[in-house]
UniProtKB/Swiss-Prot annotation:
Top-level taxonomic group: Bacteria
Boundaries of every RNase III domain copy: 8-135
The protein's enzyme class: hydrolase
Protein name per its UniProtKB record: Ribonuclease 3
Signal peptide: none
Subunit structure: Homodimer.
HAMAP family documented for this protein: RNase_III (MF_00104)
Residues annotated as binding Mg(2+): 48, 121, 124
Protein source organism: Phenylobacterium zucineum (strain HLK1)
A molecular-function term among this protein's GO annotations: double-stranded RNA binding
NCBIfam families: RNaseIII
Length: 238
């Protein structure tokens, strides 16, 4: 048994489920970068689409069961914390999916195996494969097992993110809301790098970088927040 076959076996052991359709499992674990150029390789992108919907269903029904009196807005906020690609990537690592992935040599070289975006997508594809091969109960069992820590994180006190802090600050100053603009987007699709510029009236502009647009916006907002102890609006440069 080679290293990857051992990793796939370990993945199934951790999940507690052995696939009947081995081709389906292989497709769920195959990144779009795989292919020799001579023929199409069935990869996991279509499965991601289905897996995202199954994941949202499992998370939504669990949230409703945990708090029957929760308002829709609060559940939507909690749902967003449970189904983003960072949460999916953490679940993928807990399951041992990282080493079981099929990646091209070039994708492996640039670190795709450690990419939250790649791992998150693969996790959604795996959920879809579990749903197809074993039904909703099998997919739900995976979710409950590997999202347990994510539910624990919901109870942790959370500091406001930089974008929220910046918005509250400018509103308190009576200024227009900050504006964000993508300055550049570089790198391959599985490992992009964004640069975003934020502007606040009277305080100029600041830039931030990140692996996603949202991360870059937060970085830019954090840089702008450092100007709060600077000159008042309209006095910049005086």
């Amino acid at each position: 048994m080679n290293a990857r076959a051992a990793a796939v076996a370990e993945l199934e052991r951790r999940i507690g489920y052995v696939f009947t359709d081995r081709d389906l499992l292989e497709r769920a674990l195959t990144h779009a970068s795989v292919g020799d150029g001579a023929r199409a390789v069935r990869h996991n992108e279509r499965l991601e689409f289905l897996g995202d919907r199954v994941l949202n269903l499992c998370a939504a029904e669990r949230l409703m069961a945990l708090d029957p009196d929760a308002r829709e807005g609060e559940m939507s906020r909690l749902l967003a914390s449970l189904v983003n690609y960072h949460a999916c990537a953490r679940a993928a690592k807990r399951a041992g999916l990282q080493e079981a992935l099929r990646l091209s040599a070039s994708a492996t070289k640039v670190g795709a195996r450690k990419s939250d975006a790649v791992l998150g997508d693969a996790c959604e594809a795996l959920i879809a494969a579990l749903y197809i091969d074993g039904g909703l109960e099998t997919a739900r069992a995976f979710f409950l097992k590997f999202w347990d820590e994510e539910f624990a994180r919901l109870d942790e006190p959370r500091a406001k993110d930089p974008k929220t802090q910046l918005q509250e600050w400018v509103q308190g100053m009576g200024l227009p809301l900050p504006t964000y603009e993508i300055v550049s987007q570089e790198g391959p699709p599985h490992a992009p790098s964004f640069t975003v510029e934020v502007q606040v009236a009277g305080f100029g502009a600041e830039r931030g970088e990140g692996r996603s647009r949202q991360a870059a916006e937060k970085a830019a907002a954090q840089c702008m927040l450092l100007k709060r102890e600077g000159p008042e609006p309209g006095k910049v440069g005086e």
